[in-house]
């Protein structure tokens, strides 16, 4: 299972929710979705994982491989990243 960190009022995150909805409609549930802008505990977890690699949300993360994607991405970027994760 992957994790998608987002901010509730983040416009870039809203677009990525749409992308995840479409992806998961095809492939099943892949992501835990974690809101961090209004949840200090989850924000601290994200900061520990991020290690200043991205510095914000949207942040897609695979805890098994410690790989990630940052920011608003294109559908093909997510598709390629997921394939690289050997689903």
Predicted regions, residues:
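Generic recognition of short, well-ordered alpha-helical segments
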Residues: 14-18, 44, 73
